[in-house]
Amino acid sequence: MNKDIKKLRHEYGQRSLTRSEINSNPFTQFRIWFEEAVKMQLPDANAMTLATVSPDNRPSARILLLKDFSEKGFCFFTNYQSRKGKDIDKNAYGALVFFWPELERQIRIEGKITKLKAEDSNQYFFERPIGSRMAASVSPQSTEIENRESLIEMMNQFENEHGTIFNRPDFWGGYQLQPDLFEFWQGRENRLNDRIEYTLENKKWKHRRLAP
């Protein structure tokens, strides 16, 4: 084992997650933590890991950006023909992880993923910068390309043909993960970390403390 890696260690203990600090609604608890991360101007505070599973039970994970959340779910946008899109098409269950090391906090969220309505995808698509819209329209995400130059050429050709006025491609849009489980993790001294798990039972949220 690499001894240098074994020496990498950070002691936690800046904050706590006690019974009095826990909100009974996990969406409210998420909002409190998320807004604190944003207020501290943490880089990419809305970055999250999305884990999906393929039809042959191979998991994969990648970093995405959260674009909206409410009690209906957590929203992100991508190419429907990407690996994650194909995974979701066959297995609608996934997991999200938010990690804010500066706050010594992590949130895990599990649930079912569904596509957003076309009008919601359209609204966000046209809010994006023109370059991002073009990239979403031309990139054959998760497929092999010859080189980067070929991708730039596709982008230039698309711009020459369509200019700045074009519709959202049918293969690109939004998803929403509707949670049935949350886990809030707060780093504590001596690795006796706080873990609070929320589960949805009979349409009501219940929470319990887990051992670290």
Show where each model-derived region lies.
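Binding-site signature for planar aromatic cofactors or substrates
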Residues: M1-P212
